Structure formats: structure tokens, C-alpha cells
Amino acid sequence: MIDESDKSLFRSTVDQQKPIDKDGVKNTVTSKSGANQLFQKYSFLYEPNISGSEAVIHYKSGLSSKVLKKMKQGNMGPTPSIDLHGHKVEEACQSLSKFIHFHSNERFIHIIHGKGYHSDSGLSIMKSQVVHYLKQHPAVLAFCSCTQEMGGTGAVFVHLKAHV
């Protein structure tokens, strides 16, 4: 039998906890500086323009070729990951914004967007939106399609600016 003091201690501890989203992203956003604010000024892309099998790469000028090579080979070590399968475009952008904000202290992240093989046009809606979104995000220095083991053309590695 559990005594009342143990029940009380357990209840007081559990009551202070908040549930975690399925994608592991905090729902609350608090920021002390403008540099670390949640990015919400993105635009949506409603017409897909990238096929599921197409490799993608984008980087800002001045990025080290060593970093790009490391990304292409998947040699970044463990990276936080988000899977956007099953999300609607708007939900995916919101989740992605929260995910990047939450992991702003990381240098690399992994985004699984899928290849969109079930789309009518043969073009990937989610992949096109993720690429469009990442090009707009101020914290993103580079991204490229993953190695086969990490999702191939259905996922991207993203290099984020160092958190200042």
C-alpha cells in the first residue's frame, strides 16, 4: 500500500509537468533577444516544383567547402530530427519554425519531408515547401539532401548559424 505522503509527493511532481508534442517541439516560445525569435515571416508555396527523386542543395556565400562536404557525407554526428510525414503544409511550416527555434543551439539538424510519390503531379508538395521555407529562414546557412541511410532525397541536413 502507498502511504499518503508518497501520493502527495508524486502528485505535486506530476502536476508540474507539461505534455510533450509528438515531434518533440516545445509549444512555448520565450526569447530575451530579437536574434532568437521564432521565425514566422515565411511564405507558402502552393505549387510544387521539385520531384521526389531530385537532390537539393543550397548554401549561402562564404560557407566553408569542408562543412558542405561534411553535410553531403552525413558526417555531422548525432543531429536532432523532425519527421513531417502526414503534416499539412501550414502545420509543417509551424512545426519546422518551432523545431529550428528550439534547436537553435545546434549546428546541424535533420528534416524528413518525404519524397511525395503519392502526389498526383509526381512533384513533392512537402519537399518543395521545405526547400522554399529553408531558403527564407534567417538561421539557415545551408541544406542538402541526405545520404541514402538517412533518407536520401526524402530528407535534408540543415546547417544553422551559430547561436549568439
Spans of model-derived segments:
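Long, charged, low-complexity intrinsically disordered regions
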Residues: 1-108, 112-164
